[in-house]
Amino acid sequence: MANSPQSKKRARQAEARAAVNKARRSRIRTFLRKVEEAIASGDPAAAAAALKTAQPEMARGVTKGVLHKNTVARKMSRLAHRVKVLSVPAAA
């Protein structure tokens, strides 16, 4: 348990930051889920729109230190590829 005033304050700050980070991560997951649902529905326009709204949220997660840069880059790349494949008609 924190004993000194400084360590008590640090514990409070860490708890507050953890709550903010948890909320931000949850928000990002919600945007990703919307993209996944749009891809699953098969609607290229909806998928592209959902991806367009999700990308800034994911990038914000990187700048705020919630997610790692490479993780977000990988997720964005994979989602963009899936949306692109959805919008291009399948070659027979």
Curated annotation (Swiss-Prot):
Domain of life according to the entry: Bacteria
Signal peptide from the UniProt entry: none
Region named Disordered: 1-23
Keywords for the protein's UniProt record, in alphabetical order: Ribonucleoprotein, Ribosomal protein, RNA-binding, rRNA-binding
Coiled-coil positions: none
GO cellular component: small ribosomal subunit
The protein's role, per its UniProt record: Binds directly to 16S ribosomal RNA.
PANTHER family: 30S RIBOSOMAL PROTEIN S20, SMALL RIBOSOMAL SUBUNIT PROTEIN BS20C
Protein name: Small ribosomal subunit protein bS20
Source taxonomy: Bacteria, Pseudomonadati, Pseudomonadota, Alphaproteobacteria, Rhodobacterales
